């Protein structure tokens, strides 16, 4: 090949575009070395000139095997158009200074640039390494320099890297590789010994998580794993160029390149070594190689694992159905060759397999098809098989070798150690973090090689849910057969061979310590913190002894923890996780029967009493004292509570989940809301009569009916339209407790309770003040008894007994559950007693009505019957004042002149 002109600093530029050379995939028969299979998998390949000692990829006839490569013919013209496919896609007229160079085009533009152009690569992995994905990218070429020059080279660009790409430079006794990604303005740089006058193979790989690695003659030379931020780096061009730049302050070097190759993935160390040995010949040395240069006297044997790694990389691009993918991975795990693994191959196989598993978990159909957990458990078992094979076949000459890494699937460790090499008091995996497993040092007694495999899965727990207790070997969980379990922590695995010597008794030692930080979903956290539920946490492991993964707690005990973490002690090793079971609080059968009996009897009695109350109010409606607004409110409240309790009694015999049950749930919701709404009206009316006077009763009549019947209807319409499926679908014909629809009842009910309690306190203070004044003026001790009586009378109509329902939310508040059942179910009885049977106005009206009936039966007095008035009931003639003062009237001279008839 022809050498390039004198270069001040030999550069490899990626400025990028579209007319690359693609490599044929069929391996020629004449080239059986596995390194040529690595070369055949390249994305772009420019063989350039034939160089003695550097082998190219040939077909069966010995011809160069490339695609879309046109070797430029001899040109006599001084100028050619470079949009000719023989040159490049540049649409400019250039001067061919040297003609054909390395089967590229050596150009000199007006700006004085001396370059080899290979085309442009817009929007590709080559133009932007950040677009290569997690697989990364690899650049490879052979390079040599021809010594110093005394004359300067033609003028060229000075120190610029264009677009996202890389730069390779040799100057002043140093070689360097720089790689830049414009997307995040990151730069990686590594230095190495520059090539001399002998052909040197330079290859570098880049992966976003591993950074830059530079290999010289097949061996890792230097690296930059982290990189740094650089915002002022490069120009936005897209050409792929090998060329030179001039710096008058530096020495000038001639340089030459051969076999320029790009893989759109990062090669493994084994692949790099195989390609290098293939390129230089099975037993050949590099031509003109000095004695001090590393040589390859023997050929690396065919790596039995390389085809598996390659197939995994290729097959995962075609993954679609989880079931098919799982069977493929299981076949891979069962057909792994029983051959030794170097550290590099073991690490590569581990990373590739776990990366493949990560691709499986990202399939849109995986979540749906893995709902029964069998698919996920099969995947975990397959991973265990592969990792066990890798650890058992890992070869090492050192007493302690550990391979560690992390992927989207799991954090892993594969170790092969001699126990005497372990000096720490315990072995811990992983070494850092809140979730880990510890093995005491005294449990590792074996003097032979010990293999250790650790896996901390990142997302596997999300796919292990809805576990039926009957399908587990956790006796405590079976106590609630309908309460499903779910994984509440990371899944962590640790396998040691030969197994550690552990106590078979949980009270003995040594034992395995498993410390797991909980990873709760929003639903899990909500269920766990709900006071109506009881939370159970189990230390569990996956038992594959039966061929299928079964969760078991045998040999494990939870020794410490809370809602954030759990600590377990176990007598064995395997896959561990914390299982969570949420059990709704349930009373004993005896308490359930007692509370049900109270509810049945109380509601039945209330229905009868409320019916009697409504009949009484209807019969006495012609009496003026019963026609006032207060008794209208009592009647509406009684009717709402009556209908609600009748519907409640009917719901006890309905089948949940049916359409009639759903309709009944809607009616229950509405009528219980109306009951609370009329309790609120009772409170507001009491406030207006005792504390303030807002106006006449007639002016508030429509407002009260709007609150009592209109507001509940509006709330129900909104609730039904937004969550109709929450009605009658749980264990009873009521709103589903697990959904937000329950707040369409609880919210208004709590509001009414709070408002009425405030009103009750205010009214009680007024009554107490009047009672105190009455006692001071008249010395009547019965005034204090009237305060207690007034409170007792107001409680049923204000609904404050529902406070006990709020307090009765757990099994530790059993007394409140009984109090709520008694007071709430007997609300109708209390209304009938306090506001009908024992009410003086109602009794007086009833006596008057009785007299009217008796007079009506006598024809002699029918025509003389006069309208009844409150004055007549009180024993006073119309127009005269009563001479008998009640305790309330005795205080009329005080400042508290209020209307207490509402009480």
UniProtKB/Swiss-Prot annotation:
Extracellular compartment spans: 27-599, 654-662, 723-740, 811-813
GO cellular component, as recorded: cytosol; nuclear speck; plasma membrane
Record carries keyword Cell membrane: yes
Site, Cleavage: residue positions: 573-574
Membrane topology: Multi-pass membrane protein
Residue ranges constituting the GAIN-B domain according to the UniProt record: 401-586
Polar residues: compositionally biased ranges: 862-885
Observed phenotype of the null mutant: Decreased, but not abolished, stimulatory effect of 5alpha-dihydrotestosterone (5alpha-DHT) on local cAMP production and on muscle strength.
One MF annotation (Gene Ontology) recorded for this entry: G protein-coupled receptor activity
GO biological process: adenylate cyclase-activating G protein-coupled receptor signaling pathway; cell surface receptor signaling pathway; G protein-coupled receptor signaling pathway; neurogenesis; regulation of skeletal muscle contraction
Keyword presence, Zinc: no
Ranges in the topological domain labelled Cytoplasmic: 621-632, 684-701, 762-789, 835-903
Region (Stachel): 575-583
Glycosylation site residues: 68, 76, 83, 89, 217, 311, 331, 338, 348, 505, 530, 543, 562
Residues binding 17beta-hydroxy-5alpha-androstan-3-one: 592
Posttranslational mods: Autoproteolytically processed at the GPS region of the GAIN-B domain; this cleavage modulates receptor activity. Cleavage takes place early in the secretory pathway before N-glycosylation.
Span of domain Pentraxin (PTX): 111-305
Transmembrane region(s): 600-620, 633-653, 663-683, 702-722, 741-761, 790-810, 814-834
Similarity comment: Belongs to the G-protein coupled receptor 2 family. Adhesion G-protein coupled receptor (ADGR) subfamily.
PANTHER family per UniProt: ADHESION G-PROTEIN COUPLED RECEPTOR, ADHESION G-PROTEIN COUPLED RECEPTOR D1
Protein's UniProt name: Adhesion G-protein coupled receptor D1
């Amino acid at each position: 090949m022809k050498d390039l002109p004198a270069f001040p600093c030999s550069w490899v530029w990626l400025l990028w575009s579209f007319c690359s050379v693609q490599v044929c995939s069929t391996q020629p028969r004449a080239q059986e070395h596995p390194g040529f299979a690595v070369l055949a998998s390249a994305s772009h390949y420019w063989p350039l000139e034939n160089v003695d000692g550097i082998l190219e990829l040939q077909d069966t006839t010995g011809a160069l095997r490339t695609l879309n490569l046109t070797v430029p013919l001899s040109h006599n013209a001084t100028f050619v158009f470079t949009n000719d496919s023989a040159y490049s896609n540049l649409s400019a007229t250039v001067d061919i200074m040297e003609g054909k160079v390395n089967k590229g085009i050596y150009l000199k533009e007006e700006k004085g640039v001396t370059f080899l152009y290979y085309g442009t690569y817009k929007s590709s992995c080559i133009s932007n390494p950040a677009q290569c994905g997690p697989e990364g990218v690899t650049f490879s070429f052979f390079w040599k320099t021809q010594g110093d020059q005394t004359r300067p080279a033609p003028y060229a660009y000075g120190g610029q890297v264009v677009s996202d790409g890389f730069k390779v430079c040799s100057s002043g006794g140093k070689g360097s590789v720089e790689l830049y990604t414009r997307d995040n303005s990151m730069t990686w740089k590594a230095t190495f010994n520059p090539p001399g006058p002998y052909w040197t193979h330079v290859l570098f790989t880049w992966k976003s998580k591993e950074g830059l690695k530079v290999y010289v003659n097949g061996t890792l030379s230097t690296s930059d794993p982290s990189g740094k931020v650089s915002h002022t780096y490069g120009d936005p061009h897209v050409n792929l160029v090998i060329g030179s730049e001039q710096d008058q302050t530096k020495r000038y070097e001639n340089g030459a390149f051969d076999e320029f190759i790009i893989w759109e993935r990062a090669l493994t160390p084994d692949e790099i070594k195989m390609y290098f040995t293939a390129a230089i010949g099975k037993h050949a040395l590099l031509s003109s190689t000095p004695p001090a240069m590393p040589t390859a006297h023997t050929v690396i044997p065919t790596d039995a694992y390389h085809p598996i790694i390659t197939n995994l990389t290729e097959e995962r691009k075609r993954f679609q159905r989880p079931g098919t993918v799982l069977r493929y991975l299981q076949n891979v795990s069962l057909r792994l060759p029983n051959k030794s693994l170097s550290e590099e191959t073991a690490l590569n196989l581990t990373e590739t397999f776990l990366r493949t598993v990560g691709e499986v978990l990202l399939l849109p159909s995986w979540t749906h098809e893995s709902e029964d957990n069998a698919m996920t458990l099969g995947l975990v078992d397959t991973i265990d098989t592969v990792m066990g094979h890798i650890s058992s076949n890992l070869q090492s000459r050192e007493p302690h070798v550990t391979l560690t890494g992390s992927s989207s699937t799991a954090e892993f460790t594969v170790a092969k150690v001699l126990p005497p090499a372990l000096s720490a008091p315990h072995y811990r995996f992983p070494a850092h973090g809140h979730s880990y497993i510890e093995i005491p040092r005294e449990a590792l007694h074996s003097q032979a090689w010990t293999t250790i495999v650790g896996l901390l899965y990142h997302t596997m727990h999300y796919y292990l849910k809805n576990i039926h207790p009957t399908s587990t070997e956790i006796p405590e969980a079976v106590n609630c057969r309908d309460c499903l379990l779910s994984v509440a922590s990371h899944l962590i695995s640790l396998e040691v061979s030969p197994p550690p010597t552990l106590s078979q008794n949980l009270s003995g030692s040594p034992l395995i310590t498993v410390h797991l930080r909980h990873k709760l979903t929003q639903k899990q956290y909500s269920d766990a913190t709900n006071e109506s539920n009881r939370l159970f946490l189990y230390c569990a492991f996956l038992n594959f002894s039966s061929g299928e993964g079964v969760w078991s707690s045998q040999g494990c005990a939870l020794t410490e923890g809370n809602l954030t973490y759990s600590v377990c002690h176990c007598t064995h090793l395997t896959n561990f996780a914390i299982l969570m079971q949420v059990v709704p609080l349930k009373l004993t059968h005896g308490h359930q029967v007692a509370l049900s009996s109270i509810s049945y009897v109380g509601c039945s009695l209330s229905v009868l009493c409320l019916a009697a109350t409504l009949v009484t109010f209807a019969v006495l409606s012609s009496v003026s004292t019963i026609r006032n607004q207060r008794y209208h409110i009592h009647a509406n409240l009684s009717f709402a509570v009556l209908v609600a309790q009748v519907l409640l009694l009917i719901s006890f015999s309905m089948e949940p989940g049916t359409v009639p049950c759903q309709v009944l749930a809607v009616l229950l919701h509405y009528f219980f809301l109306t009951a609370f709404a009329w309790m609120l009206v009772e409170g507001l009316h009491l406030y207006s009569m005792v504390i303030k006077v807002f106006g006449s009763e007639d002016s508030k009549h429509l407002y009260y009916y709007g609150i009592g019947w209109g507001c509940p209807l509006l709330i129900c319409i909104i609730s039904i339209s937004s969550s109709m499926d929450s009605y009658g679908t749980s264990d009873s014909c009521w709103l589903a407790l697990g959904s937000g629809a329950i707040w369409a009842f609880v919210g208004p009910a709590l509001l009414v309770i709070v408002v009425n309690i405030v009103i009750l306190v205010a009214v009680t203070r007024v009554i107490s003040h009047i009672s105190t004044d009455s006692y001071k003026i008249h010395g009547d001790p019965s005034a204090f008894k009237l305060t207690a009586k007034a409170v007792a009378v107001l409680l049923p109509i204000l609904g404050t007994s529902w406070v006990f329902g709020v307090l009765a939310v757990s099994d530790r508040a059993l007394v409140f559950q009984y109090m709520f059942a008694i007071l709430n179910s007997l609300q109708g009885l209390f209304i009938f007693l306090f506001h009908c049977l024992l009410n003086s106005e109602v009794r007086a009206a009833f006596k008057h009505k009785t007299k009217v009936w008796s007079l009506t039966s006598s024809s002699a007095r029918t025509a003389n019957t006069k309208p009844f008035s409150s004055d007549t009931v009180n024993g006073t003639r119309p127009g005269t004042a009563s001479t008998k003062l009640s305790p309330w009237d005795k205080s009329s001279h005080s400042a508290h002149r209020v209307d207490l008839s509402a009480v």
